[in-house]
Amino acid sequence: MYALIEYKGKQYKAEKGAKLVVDKLSAESGSKIDIDTVLLISDGDKVTVGTPYVSGAKVSATVGDSFRERKIIVYKHKAKKNYHRTQGHRQAHTCITVDNIVG
């Protein structure tokens, strides 16, 4: 059984016991969250597609550790104008573990 969920504007395939890396959450590590924006649920041959969400369906997950990606460098340059800018960015993520899929 798996579900396609939408969380913070991105879509993820959630299966029981799967670990997902999502954008940073403000929830404490070890706390439980419920995600009710379920787009699709597949249980063997039975597939339920939402319009846009499946009513009554939810995914329960446990919040894990938060971490930051390695730094990427953003560089801007204008030819012949003596203009260049360098900026770094590190995206913050949180790991969640899917506990249960109800639907």
Swiss-Prot record:
Instruction: Name one cellular component (GO) term.
Output: ribonucleoprotein complex
Q: Which PROSITE patterns match?
A: RIBOSOMAL_L21
Provide one Gene Ontology biological process annotation.
translation
A Pfam family recorded for this sequence: Ribosomal_L21p
Concerning InterPro entries, the annotation shows: bL21-like, bL21-like_sf, Ribosomal_bL21, Ribosomal_bL21_CS
Q: Which GO terms describe its molecular function?
A: rRNA binding; structural constituent of ribosome
Keywords on record: Ribonucleoprotein, Ribosomal protein, RNA-binding, rRNA-binding
Quaternary organization: Part of the 50S ribosomal subunit. Contacts protein L20.
Q: State the similarity comment.
A: Belongs to the bacterial ribosomal protein bL21 family.
> According to its UniProt entry, what is the function of this protein?
This protein binds to 23S rRNA in the presence of protein L20.
Name of protein: Large ribosomal subunit protein bL21
Which organism encodes this protein?
Answer: Treponema denticola (strain ATCC 35405 / DSM 14222 / CIP 103919 / JCM 8153 / KCTC 15104)
Upper classification of the source organism reads:
Bacteria, Pseudomonadati, Spirochaetota, Spirochaetia, Spirochaetales
